[in-house]
Amino acid sequence: MVDSLDTATPARRRRSDARRSVDAILNAARVVIGERSDASMEEIATTAGVTRQTVYAHFPSRDALIAALIEAAAAEYAALLDAAGLDTAPPADALAQFLDAGWRFIRRYPLLLDPTATGIPRPTSNDPHDVVPPRLERLIQRGQRMGDFDGSLHAAWLAAAVIGLQHAAAAEVADGRLTAREAAALCLESTLRLCGSSARPTASR
């Protein structure tokens, strides 16, 4: 029994060390590639505080690292949406929280909106292209049923338009035409008007 515990502890420690290395590498990749989409594996290793060999031990190629980063980003965005109260908060509040989750995600993963970045894969799970529209559509439908949103327009169309508005606002920030604060405020106001909201988010009252 003692022998099995003695061997299990180093194994757990190695797994824990490996997990920390992977997390450090992914976080470094998020930051470095977010600043410069063509950053090298050497630069990522330096930022992560590990050797290039350690990076390659976990990710055999830069493409593999990017794919893992995209998977992590998709999971993080899904968690942000889960925490946003989209199905429970008052509709106007939920809509504001949906947009806020998007802004936080964009700030953490600017790579995803970088027009110079090429070869960005789609995630295999929690793909925002698949996950986000139906969740937003469900929120808008709830607001329409409650009378908080205008019910004369199709919820799927409104969801697509809201997503497009936020992408457009993010592009304005990336091009230096708006500050992040200005873009967030304009996007929220435009979204509420688009949905015909008869209520205002609690935070903006």
Task: Go through each PLM region and give its residues.
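Alpha-helical DNA-contacting segments of helix-turn-helix folds
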Residues: 59, 64-73, 116
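Basic, helix-initiating cap at the start of DNA-binding domains
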Residues: 1-35, 39-47, 64-67
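Short hydrophobic/aromatic patch on the recognition helix
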Residues: 49-59
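Short secondary-structure transition hinges
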Residues: 64, 103-138
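Hydrophobic alpha-helical connector segments
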Residues: 68, 79-108, 121-124
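Hydrophobic/aromatic-rich alpha-helical bundle segments in the mid-to-C-terminal region
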Residues: 113-118, 126, 130-133, 145-190, ...
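Hydrophobic/aromatic residues within well-ordered alpha-helical segments
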Residues: 69, 73, 77, 98-102, ...
